[in-house]
């Protein structure tokens, strides 16, 4: 039995290969997305790395919640310091402990390019380390936020280990009187983690795995034979979760200018793979390429830069405030466990630890080997108030199936795009010109007059058939797909939270089926061999137009995220070129016309001979032959008119693409139906397509498929899955409910675009199956409950006790539709009327409140609530400043709110305000956050009233407590000398929920909330207690 050609452009092979190619790409992408590469055996690990030890460390530090404002935080800090000492001693490292901190850096930083290091200053330095225990540094700053600028005072307690590099300066150079000149060599690498968790999570992924990774880096780089060339600083910072405070306090370290590069390890999910969230430049991305399992792309970096992703990490402090260059490696999935009690060791794995650790190890090792000039020198922005980290190169980077890494300059992508914009139309124009010159340009060819013998005959080529099919089908399929997005967003927008793949299946199946229905239907009505070529031409035009905008984005906006378009543009051009070159297999149009006309003449002569020889033949047969000049064929088809002798609708030569019936010109039809010509039998057209199309090659489509699909779909498909995983569960955080669904809809269209040139050849089995998939997923997506035990609805808790009003209110913040069922499951609010107000910062969320007077917090070992906060205030004699003394039991965090703006503040014993972290707003501010490292020491805060002046007395007046004070109705608009009182509200926060008796209202919520819901903290404190005073 003779087997057919498996690559012929027929329904069977096309259905098989298009399905196989897409599945061969998508299935591995999903596998990479859903799995983590296994960790190597202990024997295969780098020297000094022990994953068993790392796992035990993780279990120890995640035994309890350990936010900055908890005693467990101190225990975790002490444990990590003790483990660092143990590792150094085990590796035989002579280390010292340094208490240096609070170094006020000058505003001008030096670089080795401006002040070259003398050869005598640097010599080979032996192995060694210094452990910095910083309990000195504090920072005073303002934190500009839209409509809510606040002052901040923070006392840090970071610790960090400086691993001496072989080319670092000798001795304790950071104690030098001229430390800037010594540190200017600036080749040190900062590796950062934060050891605090949120008050509602155990912090396994955020950020425990990062910190135990730093311990393993310490063990590796202090092992024999692994001393780095450049020094490495392993920073364990505190209070990142509450405002990036630890990284800001590191700004007062004597080593901050020594570190020109950094590796920040973070967690915004709970396990899975650690992704390269963002990086500052190409050089840093190339350092990451040494990772055994790289994962990430420049798209995330561009999204952060444009504010599409608003999550903040210590990366922003190192880059924006210090001017360092480096990268952010972070866990990102599943976000439903982020900042909840499910961020624990049970929901992660050793494999995830290894994925982050291996990336950090490879990147740090690469950065520590760089020369002092690669990341050191004058900045491209010319700023002298930041670390002189050299001139970065904008880049593009992405991974291939989590196994390999591509990184190249953004200028290279721009050159690629520009080359495509200029050369591809020229090449296609030249090829088209050559085809026209050789009379082989069949696209848009209508008819050719041919003279054979004594007569002249017109031969039709059907060169416009199929021209408008693709844009029409694309518009309709896109409109229906986007319409389904809005339908889901209206009815059940959070279904993507737990059933992302169901949403993907719905969008892909809908676009596929509608595209096939329209394109296959058009081909059935008016078969055309040019449909594939026309679709490819449209694809090329679309990508060329989009590339114009991409070039502008690359050149003017430094956006590398458009790199998938360059792939599609390149391959669309190559596919169109193949379709044009295929026409060289056809005869010249005039030759074909003469051939057809000659055959027609021979046929007529043969018919006449037959008539003369058989004059008594049936009259109907004679009549049918006479009608051969006008009818399509003697045999009725689905396009034959119902009434004999009547032309079908749309039978003229100027028929539309989607005509219901049609008639072919005589010569074309005769060639298709004539059975007596051996040459035509050798090249039969497919399914009544144009007669000349039989000579076209039937295998070139497969090359076009392999050009268009594999690389482009791999690159875009990876981004599509990451997009769904990253933002699919952000709706409960207050983000847009439409954006994740719209992302899936648009990306589904873009992923299937390369299939459209071939889809009209797909047999009905595949699209009908996908139609059933669409019906099933549509019903499921519209009706299914969006949350489950593994994908729990996240809501936010806060309890406020107002000592002046005597109120105790619990606020549950979230999407009201689901918060109300949560409240109904809790005993305390039973019977209460629950009122929900709009969140002032996140319009999608609501604050639903209920009275919790029956569950007062016990945050200070039985102390009465009224005695927890002590506050006193006095004004200066001239009425221009206020001194506030504030203390609270068993907490490190308090806030001061003022009834009208103040125009300056200072904390006794604190540093002056640091302009690196924000300027003071000209309109003043009305809130100050106060953080301390100790549990007993109070705050003495001086408030500068600026233009507001309180009544002037000879002696300072002490403030009096009030039961209840209304806010200043004037909004703080006081004039100098106005007799107006200042109302100061102290709000102190408690965050330690490790004991159920401490915050019983919180534990009641945890105990009785539905299985499909999970609670997280709303603000820094799970409990806030407020107390007001007035200064008259």
From Swiss-Prot:
Carbohydrate attachment residues: 50, 138, 147, 940
GO CC annotation terms, alphabetical: vacuolar membrane
Domain of life according to the entry: Eukaryota
Chain positions covered by the region annotation Disordered: 595-688
Cofactor(s) essential for the protein: Zn(2+)
Topology feature Cytoplasmic, residues: 1-11, 437-469, 515-532, 582-701, 760-766
Co-factor binding comment: Binds 2 Zn(2+) ions per subunit.
Active site (catalytic residues): 240
Gene Ontology molecular function: metal ion binding; metalloexopeptidase activity
Pfam families registered for this protein in UniProt: Peptidase_M28, PFF1_C, PFF1_TM
Subcellular location: Vacuole membrane
Positions of Zn(2+) 2 binding: 206, 241, 339
Regions of compositional bias (Polar residues) in chain numbering: 651-660
EC number: 3.4.-.-
Composition bias type Acidic residues, residue spans: 599-608
Keyword list, A-Z: Glycoprotein, Hydrolase, Membrane, Metal-binding, Metalloprotease, Protease, Transmembrane, Transmembrane helix, Vacuole, Zinc
Protein name as catalogued: Vacuolar membrane protease
Organism: Metarhizium robertsii (strain ARSEF 23 / ATCC MYA-3075) (Metarhizium anisopliae (strain ARSEF 23))
């Amino acid at each position: 039995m003779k087997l057919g050609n498996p690559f012929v452009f027929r329904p069977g092979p096309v259905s098989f290969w298009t399905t196989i190619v897409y599945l061969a790409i998508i299935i591995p992408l999903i596998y990479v997305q859903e799995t983590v590469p296994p960790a190597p055996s202990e024997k295969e690990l780098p020297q000094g790395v022990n994953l068993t030890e790392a796992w035990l460390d993780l279990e120890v530090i995640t035994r309890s919640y350990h936010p900055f404002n908890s005693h467990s935080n101190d225990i975790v800090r002490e444990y990590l310091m003790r483990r660092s000492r143990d590792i150094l001693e085990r590796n035989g490292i002579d280390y010292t402990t340094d208490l240096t901190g609070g170094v006020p850096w000058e505003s001008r930083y030096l670089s080795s390019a401006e002040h070259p290091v003398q050869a005598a200053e640097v010599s080979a330095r032996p192995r060694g380390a210094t452990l910095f225990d910083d309990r000195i540094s504090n920072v005073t700053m303002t934190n500009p936020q839209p409509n809510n600028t606040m002052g901040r005072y923070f006392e840090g307690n970071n610790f960090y280990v400086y691993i001496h590099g072989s080319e670092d300066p000798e001795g304790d150079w950071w104690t030098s009187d001229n430390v800037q000149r010594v540190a200017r060599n600036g080749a040190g690498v900062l590796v950062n983690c934060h050891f605090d968790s949120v008050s509602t999570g155990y912090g396994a992924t955020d950020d425990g795995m990062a910190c135990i990774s730093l311990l393993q880096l310490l063990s590796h780089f202090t092992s024999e034979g692994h001393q780095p060339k450049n020094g490495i600083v392993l920073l364990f910072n505190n209070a990142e979760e509450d405002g990036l405070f630890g990284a800001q306090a590191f700004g007062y370290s004597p080593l901050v200018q020594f570190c020109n590069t950094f590796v920040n390890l973070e967690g915004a999910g709970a396990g899975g793979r650690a992704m390269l969230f963002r990086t500052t430049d190409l050089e840093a991305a190339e350092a990451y390429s040494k990772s055994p399992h790289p994962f990430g792309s420049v798209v995330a970096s561009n999204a952060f830069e444009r504010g599409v992703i608003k999550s903040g990490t210590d990366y922003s402090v190192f880059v924006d405030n210090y001017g360092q260059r480096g990268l952010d490696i972070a866990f990102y999935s599943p976000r439903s466990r982020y900042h909840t009690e499910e961020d624990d060791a049970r929901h992660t794995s050793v494999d995830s630890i290894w994925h982050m650790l291996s990336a950090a190890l490879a990147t740090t090792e690469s950065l520590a080997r760089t020369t002092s000039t690669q990341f050191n020198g004058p900045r491209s922005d010319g700023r002298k108030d930041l670390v002189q980290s050299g001139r970065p190169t904008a880049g593009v980077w992405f991974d291939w199936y989590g196994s390999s890494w591509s990184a190249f300059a953004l200028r290279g992508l721009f050159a690629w795009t520009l080359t495509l914009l200029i050369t591809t139309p020229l090449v296609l124009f030249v090829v088209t010109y050559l085809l026209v010159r050789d009379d082989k340009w069949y696209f848009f060819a209508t008819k050719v007059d041919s003279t054979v013998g004594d007569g002249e005959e017109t031969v039709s080529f059907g060169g416009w058939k199929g021209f408008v099919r693709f844009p029409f089908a694309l518009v309709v399929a896109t409109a229906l797909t986007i319409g389904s997005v809005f339908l889901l967003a209206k009815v059940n927008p959070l279904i993507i939270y737990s059933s992302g793949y169901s949403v993907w299946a719905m969008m892909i199946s809908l676009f596929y089926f509608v595209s096939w229905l329209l394109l296959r239907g058009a081909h059935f009505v008016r078969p055309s061999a040019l449909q594939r070529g026309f679709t490819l031409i449209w694809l090329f035009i679309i990508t060329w137009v989009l590339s114009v905008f991409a070039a502008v984005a690359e050149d003017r906006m430094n956006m590398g995220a458009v790199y998938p378009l360059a792939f599609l543009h390149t391959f669309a051009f190559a596919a169109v070129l193949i379709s044009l070159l295929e026409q060289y297999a056809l005869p010249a149009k005039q030759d074909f016309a003469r051939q057809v006309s000659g055959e027609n003449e021979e046929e007529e002569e043969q018919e006449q001979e037959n008539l003369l020889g058989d004059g008594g033949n049936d009259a109907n047969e004679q009549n049918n032959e006479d009608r051969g000049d006008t009818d399509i064929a003697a045999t009725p088809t689905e396009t034959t008119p119902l009434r004999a002798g009547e032309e079908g609708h749309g039978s003229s030569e100027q028929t539309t693409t989607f005509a219901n019936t049609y008639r072919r010109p005589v010569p074309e039809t005769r060639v298709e139906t004539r059975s007596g010509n051996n040459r035509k039998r050798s090249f039969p057209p497919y399914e009544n397509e144009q007669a000349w199309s039989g000579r076209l090659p039937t295998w070139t489509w497969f090359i076009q498929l392999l050009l268009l699909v594999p690389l482009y779909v791999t690159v875009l498909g990876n981004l599509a899955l990451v997009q769904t995983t990253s933002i699919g569960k952000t709706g409960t955080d207050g983000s847009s409910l439409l954006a994740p669904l719209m992302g899936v809809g648009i990306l589904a269209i873009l992923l299937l675009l390369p299939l459209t040139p071939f889809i009209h050849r797909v047999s009905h089995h595949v699209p009908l199956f996908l139609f059933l998939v669409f019906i099933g997923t549509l019903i499921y997506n519209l009706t299914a409950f969006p949350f489950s035990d593994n994908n729990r609805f996240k809501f936010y808790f806060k309890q406020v006790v107002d000592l002046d009003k005597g109120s105790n209110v619990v606020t549950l913040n979230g999407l009201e539709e689901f918060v109300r069922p949560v409240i109904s499951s809790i005993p305390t609010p039973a019977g209460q009327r629950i009122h929900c107000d709009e969140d002032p910062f996140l319009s999608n969320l609501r604050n639903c409140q209920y009275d919790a007077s029956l569950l007062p917090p016990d945050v200070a070992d039985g102390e009465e609530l009224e005695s927890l906060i002590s506050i006193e205030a006095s004004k200066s004699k001239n009425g221009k400043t206020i001194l506030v003394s504030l203390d609270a039991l068993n907490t490190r965090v308090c806030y001061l709110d003022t009834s009208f703006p103040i125009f300056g503040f200072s904390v006794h014993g604190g540093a002056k305000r640091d302009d690196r972290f924000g300027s003071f707003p000209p309109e003043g501010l009305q809130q100050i956050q106060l953080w301390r490292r100790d549990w007993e020491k109070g705050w003495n805060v001086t408030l500068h009233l600026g233009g507001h002046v309180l009544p002037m007395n000879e002696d300072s007046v002490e403030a009096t407590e009030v039961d209840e004070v209304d806010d200043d109705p004037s909004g703080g608009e006081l004039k100098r000398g106005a007799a107006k009182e200042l109302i100061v509200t102290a709000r102190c926060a408690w965050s330690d929920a490790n004991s159920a008796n401490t915050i019983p209202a919180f534990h009641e919520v945890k105990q009785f909330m539905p299985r499909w819901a999970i609670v997280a903290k709303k603000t820094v404190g799970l409990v806030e207690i407020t107390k007001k005073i007035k200064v008259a």
